[in-house]
C-alpha cells in the first residue's frame, strides 16, 4: 500500500451519529476484543459533554460501498484541572492493516487542532510503559512528556493484550501550544541532554510477556520502581532512545525541558 496515497485518501473528521459511534465500537472489538470495549453510550456522552469523537475514514472504500469505511478513531473526555479545561484522550485505535501509514498521527494532529480552537492547551492520556512503540510515538513523534506513573491503573484484566500483568500506566501530557511540541511536529526537535537519566526496557519484552510471566512481572516491577523514584525527584520522561537489546526512556528535570514551562503537577 502506497503511504502517500493512504494519506490522501484518509479523511479525519468528527463523528456525530449513533451509527458512527457503533462503528467505533466495532473497531474496538476487532482490535482489542469485546471484553474491554467501551460501549457506544460513552461516545455519546463524550460528544455532548465537551469531549471528542474523531474518526478516520478510508475514502477508497466508498468506491465499493455506499460510504467510506472507518479505519480508526479517537475518543476523548472533557475534564478540568485547577479550574482549567483539558481533554483526557481515553483511546486511539487504528485497524492493523492501516498501521505505519500515518493514520494515528493524523488523528492526534486533528485532535490537537480542534482542542486549540476551543482554547484547550493540554491533552492527557495513559499508556503502557512496556509498549515501546507507543512510547516512541508519544514522545518522539508528538512531543508529549510524562511525570506521573499509575500502578495497575485499570486492574488486572483477562485481555491477551495485558498478558495477565498489572495495568501500569504512564500519564502522557501533551502541551499543545508549547514550543517543544511545535518544534517536534515541525521535525526540528531539541537534542536530548547528555545528562539525561535512563530507565531501560528490554527490546524483546513483548516476547517475554507472552512466554514468561514471572520474568515479565519482575521487569515491570523494576521499571515501575525506577519511574517512581525519578518522578519523586521532579524528573519527567521526555524521550526514548533505542540501542542493541533495549530501549531507554530518557528523563530530565521537568523544570529544564527545552521549550516547555510546566505547571505544578496536580494529583487527581
At which residue positions do the language-model features occur?
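Conserved GNAT acetyl-CoA-binding A-motif
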Residues: 115-128
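Extracytoplasmic beta-strand-rich oligomerization domains located immediately C-terminal to a leader/signal peptide
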Residues: 129-130, 147
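Intrinsically disordered, low-complexity, positively biased terminal segments
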Residues: 1-5, 118-120, 136-142, 146-268
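Active-site acidic-Proline motif in GNAT/NAT acetyltransferases
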Residues: 95-97, 127
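Conserved acetyl-CoA pyrophosphate-binding loop and the N-cap/start of the following alpha-helix
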Residues: 98, 102-110
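Aromatic/hydrophobic pocket-lining residues that form π-stacking "cages" and hydrophobic walls in ligand
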Residues: 111, 135
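A conserved beta-strand-loop-helix scaffold within acyl/acetyltransferase catalytic domains
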Residues: 11-95, 238-243, 254-255
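A conserved beta-turn-beta hairpin within the catalytic core of GNAT-like acetyltransferases
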Residues: 79-89, 99, 121, 194-198
Amino acid at each position: 500500500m502506497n503511504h502517500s496515497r493512504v494519506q490522501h485518501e484518509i479523511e479525519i473528521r468528527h463523528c456525530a451519529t449513533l451509527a458512527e459511534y457503533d462503528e467505533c465500537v466495532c473497531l474496538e472489538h476487532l482490535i482489542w476484543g469485546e471484553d474491554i470495549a467501551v460501549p457506544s453510550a460513552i461516545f455519546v456522552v463524550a460528544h455532548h459533554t465537551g469531549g471528542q469523537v474523531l474518526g478516520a475514514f478510508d475514502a477508497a472504500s466508498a468506491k465499493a460501498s455506499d460510504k467510506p469505511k472507518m479505519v480508526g478513531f479517537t475518543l476523548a473526555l472533557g475534564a478540568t484541572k485547577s479550574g482549567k479545561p483539558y481533554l483526557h484522550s481515553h483511546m486511539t485505535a487504528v485497524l492493523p492493516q492501516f498501521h505505519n501509514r500515518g493514520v494515528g498521527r493524523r488523528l492526534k494532529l486533528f485532535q490537537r487542532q480542534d482542542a486549540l480552537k476551543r482554547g484547550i492547551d493540554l491533552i492527557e492520556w495513559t499508556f503502557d510503559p512496556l509498549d515501546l512503540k507507543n512510547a516512541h510515538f508519544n514522545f518522539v513523534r508528538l512531543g508529549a512528556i510524562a511525570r506521573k506513573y499509575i500502578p495497575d491503573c485499570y486492574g488486572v484484566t483477562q485481555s491477551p493484550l495485558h498478558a495477565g500483568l498489572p495495568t501500569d500506566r504512564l500519564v502522557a501530557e501533551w502541551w499543545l501550544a508549547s514550543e517543544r511540541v511545535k518544534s517536534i511536529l515541525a521535525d526540528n526537535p531539541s537534542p536530548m541532554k547528555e545528562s539525561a537519566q535512563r530507565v531501560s526496557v528490554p527490546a524483546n519484552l513483548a516476547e517475554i510477556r507472552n512466554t514468561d510471566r514471572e520474568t515479565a512481572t519482575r521487569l515491570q516491577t523494576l521499571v515501575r520502581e525506577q519511574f517512581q523514584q525519578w518522578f519523586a525527584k521532579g524528573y519527567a520522561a521526555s524521550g526514548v532512545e533505542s540501542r542493541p537489546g533495549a530501549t531507554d526512556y530518557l528523563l530530565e528535570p521537568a523544570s529544564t525541558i527545552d521549550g516547555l514551562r510546566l505547571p505544578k503537577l496536580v494529583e487527581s
